[in-house]
Amino acid sequence: MIVVLDVSAAIEIIFQREKSNTFKSIYNQGTWIIAPDLFIAEITNVLWKYHKAGLISHIDCIQYVQDGIDMIDDFIGTREL
């Protein structure tokens, strides 16, 4: 099954929030995980805001961005979608 991962779902999984089990279940069923190429900018922006708000450290921010990127098998150009 192809899964298109949205940044909000990735954040839920990374931070193991309330809906993370639901998202993880769907994510784990995926044989090909894709996301728009904007995913990288979006997840970086969200996590940078968490860092600026003092919710996560700079080191954690960098690691979580990498974790989010690593969740994706292929990035699809926005124009192709």
Name the predicted role of every residue range:
Residues I43:
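Entry/capping segment at the start of metal-dependent catalytic domains
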Residues F39-I40, D60-L81:
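Acidic catalytic patch
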Residues M1-L38, Y50-Q63:
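Short, well-structured N-terminal submotif of metal-dependent ribonuclease cores
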